[in-house]
Amino acid sequence: MCHQQLVISWFSLVFLASPLVAIWELKKDVYVVELDWYPDAPGEMVVLTCDTPEEDGITWTLDQSSEVLGSGKTLTIQVKEFGDAGQYTCHKGGEVLSHSLLLLHKKEDGIWSTDILKDQKEPKNKTFLRCEAKNYSGRFTCWWLTTISTDLTFSVKSSRGSSDPQGVTCGAATLSAERVRGDNKEYEYSVECQEDSACPAAEESLPIEVMVDAVHKLKYENYTSSFFIRDIIKPDPPKNLQLKPLKNSRQVEVSWEYPDTWSTPHSYFSLTFCVQVQGKSKREKKDRVFTDKTSATVICRKNASISVRAQDRYYSSSWSEWASVPCS
């Protein structure tokens, strides 16, 4: 009832002045206020309603301060900056009745802020989320980067299609890696998602949508990515590389197997392979062979290595990482 009252009260005061909904519920007792961010911006008027049948003796405070901001069942505030955001609490006689946390979402020059996540710039600028799938099972992993280490939370939602969404279940985002980049530390977060009713052999007609809600202190931002599974396929490297010297020859036969994680049957979900011979020095010329088979014949020079990687045979998605074996 509290949330419904809050939204209705806010509409009655603000909707005539603005055609856009500038406050919305992120989750229980947490609301996002959308602000145009420029000097002397008027901000947004927000009406908070205490979730109680009581009518009298109610006071309001912000965060840990004991300063009384107002009294009565409702509190009207003008939200202009981060100092106006935070947790508003209504009390009566020393008892907490309810609270509402206000977060801010900034828009500057018509563009929503993207301060929390780092632009990965691959495959293009303004790429904040990257996703990969090892096969066509409907399972995929997404990850993002930030230089922020504390007071940070993420939540992830996903669906296939937006007009009639089909279910995709995502787990909790977790910190998966830390790296040092010059004077800064970089943190990688990732999430695993699974399409609920995936059909690996079916042609995709609707893209998968991934939405990440990011909150740092009192700042809210959201990031989205849209893709077909076929576009984010990256197989695991081939496994079980073996060399077989050929009699009276400098050549060897290198063989390998499909990765265990690749979709089956392999006669339908086929891979193509790149075989590379690399000398000890990276400046030496690389010899490469492309094949649809799981073996190839190459010249194996002393101190060289042979590497093999895989790609979907029928769709030009990403190559796998290399699997390698030394020539001697």
UniProtKB/Swiss-Prot annotation:
Glycosylation site residues: N135, N222, W319
Instruction: List, in alphabetical order, the Gene Ontology terms for molecular function in this entry.
Output: cytokine activity; cytokine receptor activity; identical protein binding; interleukin-12 alpha subunit binding; interleukin-12 receptor binding; protein heterodimerization activity; protein-containing complex binding
The subcellular localization recorded is: Secreted
The organism named in the record is Homo sapiens (Human)
List the record's Gene Ontology CC terms alphabetically.
Answer: cell surface; cytosol; endoplasmic reticulum lumen; extracellular region; extracellular space; interleukin-12 complex; interleukin-23 complex; late endosome lumen
InterPro entries in alphabetical order:
FN3_dom (IPR003961), FN3_sf (IPR036116), Hematopoietin_rcpt_L_F3_CS (IPR003530), Ig-like_dom (IPR007110), Ig-like_dom_sf (IPR036179), Ig-like_fold (IPR013783), Ig_sub2 (IPR003598), IL-12 (IPR050676)
Question: Where are the bilayer-spanning segments?
Answer: none
Keyword Ubl conjugation attributed: no
| Related illness | Immunodeficiency 29: A form of Mendelian susceptibility to mycobacterial disease, a rare condition caused by impairment of interferon-gamma mediated immunity. It is characterized by predisposition to illness caused by moderately virulent mycobacterial species, such as Bacillus Calmette-Guerin (BCG) vaccine, environmental non-tuberculous mycobacteria, and by the more virulent Mycobacterium tuberculosis. Psoriasis 11: A common, chronic inflammatory disease of the skin with multifactorial etiology. It is characterized by red, scaly plaques usually found on the scalp, elbows and knees. These lesions are caused by abnormal keratinocyte proliferation and infiltration of inflammatory cells into the dermis and epidermis.
Q: Where is the Fibronectin type-III domain?
A: 237-328
Name by which UniProt lists this protein: Interleukin-12 subunit beta
Q: Which family does it belong to?
A: Belongs to the IL-12B family.
Signal sequence, renumbered to the chain: 1-22
